[in-house]
Design a protein with these regions (language model features):
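The conserved acidic donor/metal-binding loop of glycosyltransferases
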Residues: 85-89, 114
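Short aromatic/hydrophobic "clamp" motif used to bind/position activated sugar donors
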Residues: 81
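Glycine-rich, basic loop-to-helix element that forms the pyrophosphate-binding segment
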Residues: 60-76
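Short, flexible, basic/aromatic active-site loop/helix in glycosyltransferases
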Residues: 129-149
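A conserved acidic beta->alpha catalytic loop
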Residues: 36-45
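Conserved donor NDP-sugar-binding/catalytic core segment of glycosyltransferases
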Residues: 93-129
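Short, acidic, metal-binding catalytic loop of nucleotide-sugar glycosyltransferases
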Residues: 23-32
């Protein structure tokens, strides 16, 4: 693997959120390699990628989330790959936290975090779906449950 960690952005059409996603990845306290993958190429995507120095990879064929995300994963040449959807924004310490967790858990294959929703410029931290997802991830946080054989 060429890189320790790669952010692989999945972009579709001309999303108004794409640039905020890119900026959040570029502003990481620990830099990671960034690529952009799309099955819906456009001059808008190309301009943003050029502005931020990000290589673009185009998947040909019908656009669908399964094949697009698999393509994004396979184009990333990294030990760890984060599939970043175009409307995701990452905390500036995300990559640092990932690499720190890797040092603590040598057999780590999945890294999961909490998240918040940005709606109309406000952070939503406690809606029903967020609490359900937190509950479902709880066994991953408890060592006794996450290392069952």
């Amino acid at each position: 693997m060429k890189y320790k960690h790669v952010f692989s952005i999945c972009a579709y059409g001309d999303s108004p959120y794409l640039e905020a996603c890119i900026r959040s990845l570029k502003e990481q306290t620990v830099p990671s390699h960034i690529i952009l993958c799309t099955s819906t190429p456009s001059s808008y995507i190309d301009r943003l990628a050029w502005r931020y120095g990000i290589p673009v990879y185009v998947r040909h064929g019908e656009s669908n989330i399964r094949d697009d995300w698999n393509f994004a994963y396979h184009m990333a040449d990294g030990e760890f790959v984060t599939i970043a959807h175009q409307d995701d924004m990452y905390h500036r310490d995300y990559a640092a936290s990932l690499l720190k967790a890797r040092q603590s858990y040598g057999d780590m294959t999945v890294f999961t975090t909490d998240y918040v929703i940005v709606k109309k410029g406000r952070l939503i931290t406690g809606d029903g779906m967020l609490w359900i997802k937190r509950l479902l991830r709880l066994p991953l946080r408890l060592h006794a449950l996450s290392h069952l054989e």
